[in-house]
Amino acid sequence: MGQRRENALAVYADDGEKFGGWPKTFKHVYEDGWLENFFSTLQAQGDWLKLITFSEAVERFSPRGKIYLPDASYREMMEWALPVKGIFQYEEVSHALGGQPWAHLARRFIKGGCWRNFRVKYPEAYQMYARMLEVSKKIASLDRNSEIFLPAEKELHKAQCNDAYWHGIFGGLYLPHLRTAIFRHLLTAETLADSHPKTYLETLDYDLDTKKEVKISNPMINAYFKPERGGHLYELDYKP
């Protein structure tokens, strides 16, 4: 890499959960010495490979140009983001492509779906996302010097843990205890940030569908209703 291009820069990042969070990874990474061996191997290449941080790279190297990064993830994730019918069509195209001599040129243009489509494909994900934005706006309106700002913001950040808003091979959106944890932190953050009287009623577009919903809130509960669905109660929160 260093010989092909002057000042070549490779960026390495990996999931923190792979470093002791996943089953058996603690033993593999720490006790069996994978992490120490990994860094020792990198250091042994010091005559041509220099290890630097992200901030050091920004300071030392000028940008080579401008790019716009799309929302993206690994290949399987982009496939799962598609509607169910689209997944079958994507697989059909991928299999047909596999036997073509120019397949390696076409792969970059066949990326699957839009990662944000998880919020459309799964109503549970969109509901969490909309509630998160509602709570985020409340916290953003707080005085940053107030005593409640940092505790409320911390709870919001916990509620923004991304794993529950999508799914992979295992874990994610379809595990109810993860969604429960998101809502628990959202309710805690909202309770800290709510500047309304103890009991109030509001009509706003809470779930971002361009139609107004009705929210009734008191110290014990939040109740969300959809008038256009005959007063459907679509969310009932029990506050901590």
Model-predicted segments: where are they?
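Active-site and substrate-binding clefts of carbohydrate-active enzymes
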Residues: 2-230, 238-240
